[in-house]
Amino acid sequence: MASRYLLGFDVGSSSVKASLTDVDNGEIVASAFYPDHEAPIMAVKTGWAEQDPQMWWDNAKLSLRKIMAESGAKGEDILAIGISYQMHGLVCVDKNQQVLRPSIIWCDSRAVPYGEKAFHDLGEDFCLRNLLNSPGNFTASKLAWVKDNEPELFDKIDKIMLPGDYLAMKLSGEVKTTISGLSEGMMWDFNQKKPAKFLLDYFGFDESILADIVPTFSVQSVVSKAAAEELGLKEGTPISYRAGDQPNNAVSLNVFNPGEIASTAGTSGVVYGVLGDVNYDPKSRVNTFAHANYTTDLDRLGVLLCINGTGILNAWVHRNFTPDVSYADMNDLAASVPIGSDGVKIIPFGNGAERVLENKEVGCSIRGISFNKHNRAHVVRAAQEGIVFSFCYGMEIMQQMGMDIKNIHAGKANMFLSPLFRDTLAGVSGATIELYETDGSAGAAKGAGIGAGIYKDHNEAFASLKKLAVIDPDEANRSAYLEAYSAWKEEMKKL
């Protein structure tokens, strides 16, 4: 029997990862990323961040070459292709599909004043009711900056797109996007259920600048003859799924239905929950986007909480307090200290402005230290507790929006490798933590299987998803966890 594979790409700002999954058993056959160091981000001015889209394409080709060599797969063995990508990045092309300027990526802040002015001029309530967010620093505002500062270049733009749309264009020669993609760029009107003409008109954009909309799970385009020859793929292979990295992480964890939660805890941390009705936070402390399975007939919204000071704080503590031990030993050191860290509290917001704090930049602070009582173990535990407390602080906003948080799905990676972190999150939130063996590029591959009709639904696609651990709340220590969280929130009131 011939091998049957699905191919997934994950276009990040640090690398592009590719994975092959076996259609029949769901296993990852091969995966690789390129480059093996952090990809460059250009910062011509403070607060700017740009990348050359051609670099993404080159890195995709090189990572694909690695997995094809590792697996021995042939182009005709690949039945469908899916794409995950860094959200919010702006790619501009002309009528010949030539990139006009470097992509303004997610962490570039130059467009903030454009989004803030639009929010004020159009009316905050109006924007929230229709976009579910402030226009903020998202893709539409980035394009407004280009129009204002590079007018001659703007006049040459035929289409704009997101990083995943760009990779699909290079594979197929066709420019497409999704409702989920438009929503993450603040270009989808949830009331009218069509592109947000009012915002396009406000910024002076013609609607024709948007790519044609295709369903997230569908045969969106196929591999062109030119791309097939360049990559060793089969011409006509369906490109049948694309989603931003956070919706895709949820997809990878089989999080599709209202009340289901996905989380990541890398350099920054994310809690992403699915709502079954249109809702938003009036203060925009969390963002609401169309989830991957949103359609004009089915409301499935992804509510995204981001905490910038997550793994970056843990790494800072390791570097400055425990450089002589491994992360695993550091976790053991923290576990030697009681819940609440004997009164030491860390406010973890030292990685820029935090949206959950209404974009305030308050910095990180360590509080309650006694030179006669505390040591580095207290600081290590307080750091992990502070990260968890900030997650729970944001999850309270999500609960106010109607989300019932009973289970949190996560990959067993980054901060979720720490038993203390997991136990504290379960203890404070009262939710059961389920850890899975998962990967963004493999999730995109399985998403492609759904979109191409190879799998009948997401339950079949992710039937092989391996559950590695289940962490239930420790009811015996629940009051101690909640007391520590309450004391931390008292410190928050002093900010």
Map each language-model feature to its residues.
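Residue-level signal for inorganic ion chemistry
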Residues: 26, 52, 81, 108, ...
